[in-house]
Structures are given as structure tokens and as C-alpha cells.
Amino acid sequence: MKFIIKLFPEITIKSQSVRLRFIKILTGNIRNVLKPYDETLAVVRHWDNIEVRAKDESKRAAIVAELTRIPGIHHILAVEDRPYTDVHHIFEQTLEMNRERIEGKTFCVRVKRRGKHEFSSQDVERYVGGGLNQHVASAQVQLNRPQVTVNLEIEDERLILVTARYEGIGGYPIGTQEDVLSLISGGFDSGVSSYMLMRRGCRVHYCFFNLGGAAHEIGVRQVAHYLWKRYGSTHRVRFVAINFEPVVGEILEKVDDGQMGVVLKRMMVRAASKIAERYGVQALVTGEALGQVSSQTLTNLRLIDNASDTLILRPLISHDKEHIIKLAREIGTEDFARTMPEYCGVISKSPTVKAVKAKIEHEEQNFDFAILERMVEEATNVDIREIAEKAQEEVAEVETVASFSHNDVILDIRSNDEQEARPLEVEGVVVKSLPFYKLATQFGDLDQSKSWLLYCERGVMSRLQALYLHEQGFKNVKVYRP
């Protein structure tokens, strides 16, 4: 099978040297993501597209799913590469491929041609379109907004028949821009803002301020790992966790109620800036949107920025909440966010919307900055690929099994598209489906007299979810690793 990868249009208008660099990076990213699916897979770069060739037809759906999530790809064409002798031969092959597809529908033919030929692209469009119209009585030519567009590409003596088109997410390939550090809370905003910077070509590292204990960190790890695995797995990234409970305690004790929200955000920016400096990261990313909460007025945002010299990027600054939730739904983080606790909003009962710099600085004089320094020094730094190993250490009390008894039920917690692409079939045991993002709210509805064996392909999500469910009091949970 063969796919032609079309580049994000902004890549094609770059200078020759920049364009070649972007294409080279994108080619490497594609190869890194797809190699586990097919060792014989070939990725070949050209000036205006990238070819992907694979032999294992059973992996087609999985390969397509991965390609649609790699930044830098505008769309993917599944194609069949055939020789041809003349224009009539092109028509015959097109009719064979598209007869059923255009029956009872309006259609048009679009041709792209490269090389020297005795005919033009328009000649082929007219000939093939007219022939299809004659041989498929129920079909009708319609050049504007047809129901079906028959796409053909001709390269020298090769005919490329497009069998399917899949839309990519666009953007720049990850690695073409510098690294950023996302302040992730697990909510709607931080997940979407992280995705938007990945889509713009940045390698996104994650910094989490833990205000709610182990369960909160587990939940945020799941979000970060999901975003990385789905959109950024071409590169290694860090997940840094900072215990901020002592900092919050100091603020509650030493800072005036109305100033707490802004002071807390300034402390977060200071801490994140130190982490960014430690690892050579150029900018911070937050999910703040103008006016969404009291700390996100222009006056307060400016004061928050003044806490550090590090550049702060706010990709959602002009987005409303409805649009942010829609984006979260599209990228798959909505269900995470809906079950994630929010702690920052409850720190102050009557927060100021227009903080005064002198007053904020006066309140911060009462703060013991040694606490902040200590928390930054004690921050944990994990390669996001090692989250599975760290989860394994933390869920030692959660049993991992490869076989099952009469009371066991396997619970496939993979996302719906993964289950459709690679269905789980195990003889001798019932297999049920409940995507991981629904476990927090729906696991309690399952038959608790059964022993539930959580399954995911790599064991990362199943271990994290098993730990979370154990902490919620569900002891009838194990991890299934065949």
C-alpha cells in the first residue's frame, strides 16, 4: 500500500533551504511514528510531497490514524500506482476504480500532472469525465461542489489513482521550532494550548503544580501522556511535577485574600521559569484567556508576566470557553477535563480584577521564598515515555495478570478509534469496552461482584487507571498484560 503525504501549505512558501529542512524533519517524524507498525515501511521525501510505502495491509487503518495526527501534514492520499499507455487507458482504469463510487451521484474529475506529455491536465479531465458520464448512466457531471471528486495524478509514465483522502491537522512539523514548557493542570484550557503549540512545531514539555495530592497528579499525567502519545510522540519530552501545597499554604497564611490569585500565578510563573532555564526551554505556555477569570484581566496578566523575564505564550487569549471546549472535544481531551478537579479557583473568596503592582509586591514581602526555592529543587522530572515504568512502581499493590479465572472480565479501556482499528479478542473470557476517559464516572456502574482486568496496548493507561480506581476504593481491579 502507498500513501502520498501533502505538506501544510505554509511549508511550501518557505525559502528553499527552510522548506527542505522542514520536509526532512517531517520525514523523520513520520518514520519514527510508523516504524513500530511495519519494520519494512519506507518513507521517501520529495520536493512537494512525501511517499509512505508499507507491505502489511492489516496495518492500514492504524497507519492512517497516526498520519492524520502528525503536525505538518495537510492531507493524506491513499493511492494505487499503475502504468498506463494512453489517455484511454487512464479512463479505463479510472472507471474500474470509481464506477460504484459515482453511481447515482454528481462528480467531477481533477487531474494533476508532472512531466512531459502530449496531453494537458484539462484534456485528461474532459476525456475521463466524459467517459465516466457515458458509462455510468446514473452519474452526472457537476463541476461546482460535486458529491464526489475523482482525483488523478500523472507523473511521467505512472498513473496515480487516489482511492481515499484523509485530512491531517496541518501546522509545522514538531522540531522545526524551539522547545516550550506548558503549565498543565489537566483542564480544558491547558490541554488545548499544549496541542496548539505542538501543532505549531514546538516540542512541548509539561510542568504540573500539584495542589491536590496523588490522584490529581495521576490524572494530569494521563492527559500529558495522551497528548504526547497522540500528537507529539516523535520527540522525547519531560513531565515535571512540583509539589505546590506548601506554597499555597504560605499564601493562605501570609497574603491578603484579594491578592491571592495573582500572587499564586506569579509564584507558578517564577517556578516554571526556573524549570525552563534549567532545561534550556525558551518559553512558557498557559491556557489563559482574556477575562475568563479574575486573574486573567489585562492588568493582572501584565503583573503575572512581570514576575519573570521568560516569554509567556497564551495561544487561547482571544478564545471563548465554548470554542475551547469544542477544540478539546476534537483533540480528545474533553472527557479528561470534565473529571479533573480545579483547585486554583478556590484559593480566594473575593479576588481582585485590577491588582496594583505596589500592593502585590508588598504582599509578596511576607512570603517565605525559601519554600518556593525548595519546592523547585525537589521537583520530579520524568521522561514522559517512562510514565509506564513510574506507574508500575506506584501500583505495586495492583496485581498484573496474563491469565484469568471464571469471575474475571477484561475491560478494554483504549479509545474508540484504537478499538475499531485493532479489536481485542480473547477466548474464554468476556471482553467489555469502556474508554479510559469514562472510567472515573462510569466504573462504579459496572457489576462490582466481578474482577475487572484493565487492558490497553502498552500498559501505561491501564496501570494509571488501576491506581486511580484503587485510591477511589475499588479493589476489584487488576491490570491485564497478555
Swiss-Prot record:
Q: What are the GO MF terms of this UniProt record?
A: ATP binding; CCA tRNA nucleotidyltransferase activity; tRNA binding; tRNA-uracil-4 sulfurtransferase activity
Q: Look up keyword Cell wall biogenesis/degradation and say if it applies.
A: no
List, alphabetically, the GO terms of the cellular component aspect.
Answer: cytosol
In what residue span(s) does the THUMP domain sit? 61-165
Annotated CDD domains: PPase_ThiI, THUMP_ThiI
Q: Which cysteines are joined by disulfide bonds?
A: C344-C456
The record's keywords, sorted A to Z, are:
ATP-binding, Cytoplasm, Disulfide bond, Nucleotide-binding, Redox-active center, RNA-binding, Thiamine biosynthesis, Transferase, tRNA-binding
All residue ranges annotated as the Rhodanese domain in the record? 404-482
- Broad class of where this protein is predominantly found: cytoplasm
Binding positions (ATP): L183, I184, K265, G287, Q296
Highest taxon of the lineage: Bacteria
GO biological process per UniProt: thiamine biosynthetic process; thiamine diphosphate biosynthetic process; thiazole biosynthetic process; tRNA 4-thiouridine biosynthesis
Q: Which InterPro entries match?
A: Rhodanese-like_dom, Rhodanese-like_dom_sf, Rossmann-like_a/b/a_fold, ThiI_AANH, ThiI_fer, ThiI_N, THII_Thiazole_biosynth_dom, THUMP_dom
Q: Which SUPFAM superfamilies match?
A: Adenine nucleotide alpha hydrolases-like, Rhodanese/Cell cycle control phosphatase, THUMP domain-like
Residues at the catalytic site: C456
> Which reaction does this enzyme catalyse, per its entry?
[ThiI sulfur-carrier protein]-S-sulfanyl-L-cysteine + a uridine in tRNA + 2 reduced [2Fe-2S]-[ferredoxin] + ATP + H(+) = [ThiI sulfur-carrier protein]-L-cysteine + a 4-thiouridine in tRNA + 2 oxidized [2Fe-2S]-[ferredoxin] + AMP + diphosphate; [ThiS sulfur-carrier protein]-C-terminal Gly-Gly-AMP + S-sulfanyl-L-cysteinyl-[cysteine desulfurase] + AH2 = [ThiS sulfur-carrier protein]-C-terminal-Gly-aminoethanethioate + L-cysteinyl-[cysteine desulfurase] + A + AMP + 2 H(+)
**Subcellular location field:** Cytoplasm
EC no. given is 2.8.1.4
This protein's pathway reads: Cofactor biosynthesis; thiamine diphosphate biosynthesis
State the similarity comment: Belongs to the ThiI family.
Q: Show the HAMAP family listed in the entry.
A: ThiI
The UniProt function text for this chain reads: Catalyzes the ATP-dependent transfer of a sulfur to tRNA to produce 4-thiouridine in position 8 of tRNAs, which functions as a near-UV photosensor. Also catalyzes the transfer of sulfur to the sulfur carrier protein ThiS, forming ThiS-thiocarboxylate. This is a step in the synthesis of thiazole, in the thiamine biosynthesis pathway. The sulfur is donated as persulfide by IscS.
Name assigned to this protein? tRNA sulfurtransferase
